[in-house]
Design a protein with these regions (language model features):
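An N-terminal-biased, well-structured beta-alpha scaffold segment characteristic
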Residues: 1-53, 188
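Aromatic pocket-lining residues of Rossmann-like dinucleotide-binding sites
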Residues: 130-131, 195
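Phosphate-binding beta-alpha-beta segment of Rossmann-like dinucleotide-binding domains, i.e.
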Residues: 56-114
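Glycine-rich Rossmann-fold phosphate-binding loop(s) that bind the pyrophosphate
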Residues: 113, 120-121
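N-terminal Rossmann-fold NAD(P) dinucleotide-binding loop
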Residues: 124-125
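A short helix->loop->beta-strand "cap" motif at the edges of active sites that frequently abuts
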Residues: 24-29, 47-51, 136, 197-199, ...
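Phosphate-coordination loops involved in phosphoryl transfer and adenosine-cofactor binding
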Residues: 27, 111-114, 189, 198
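Rossmann-like adenosine-cofactor binding region
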Residues: 16-22, 143-241
Length: 244
């Protein structure tokens, strides 16, 4: 947060937490550079008459690309192969040795795999459509999807009524929901137990959608193959199987 916030008329915020801040009397509005507003004290703003607005969809394509990249990184050990090359820069026989070592970085195609998309807002719909174009069998769940949103999905994207159907059926699960009471830690010990062995979970939406402790246990046991997230924190950073 900038030093001159105390005199601000308007604040532009990305990820900084504002709940513990004293809102200046001069403040008229807060603009969130993104869709979620969970880092903004909405009740306090309402009491003071501060207008809050967001920018849903502004970064949707960029996040979609990150999710697709995350699925590919989780399917093929590209990171491991890159580290192997970096550790063998002085090896005169690197080309020959790589032929022997590359089997350690083998992976699987995502074509034909089942992807579950939980939350079909601007980002979720783009992910679903792009994954379907890449040959994945896509399932989506969103009880609040609009008619316009549903019509923007490709015809082969399967809409399901519950998250549980996705937890049980899909090889990849990506979450794209806001953080509310119903979604907080929705990826937890109980829901992970429903999932296929070796599932890949992706979270580019909100940090607290996933129970870190349950996820780390699932990674250690092999229940979850990879956890790909845009929210590294002390609980998951450096844990085997985490791509962050």
């Amino acid at each position: 947060m900038t030093d001159n916030f105390a005199d601000a008329d308007v604040a532009l915020v990305r990820s900084a937490a504002m709940h513990d801040l004293d809102l200046p009397e001069s403040l008229l509005a807060i603009a969130r550079a993104g869709a979620g507003v969970n880092n903004i004290p909405l009740d306090k703003c309402a009491d003071k008459g501060v207008v809050v607005f967001n920018t849903p969809g502004a970064n949707a394509n960029g996040v979609k690309e990150l999710v697709l990249c995350g699925m590919l990184l989780a399917s093929r050990d590209i990171i491991g192969g890159n580290k192997w090359v970096a550790n063998n820069t002085d090896n005169e026989n690197i080309s020959k040795d790589m032929e022997k070592a590359k089997k350690n970085f083998a992976g699987n195609e995502i074509k034909g795999k089942k992807l579950g998309v939980i939350g079909l807002g601007a980002i979720g719909r783009l992910v679903a459509n792009a994954a379907e174009s890449m040959g994945m069998e896509v399932y989506g769940n969103d009880p609040f999807i609009s008619v316009e949103g549903a019509l923007s999905l490709k015809r082969d994207v399967h809409l399901v009524k519950t998250r549980e159907e996705i937890f049980k059926e899909c090889d990849f699960i990506t979450v794209h929901t806001p953080l509310v009471d119903d979604t907080k830690k929705m990826i937890n010990k109980e829901t992970i137990a429903m999932m296929k062995d070796g599932v890949v979970v992706l979270n580019f939406a909100r940090d607290l959608l996933v129970d870190d402790e349950a996820m780390c246990e699932a990674l250690a046991s092999g229940k979850v193959k990879k956890y790909v997230t845009d929210f590294p924190n002390p609980n998951v950073a450096g844990v085997e199987g985490v791509i962050a």
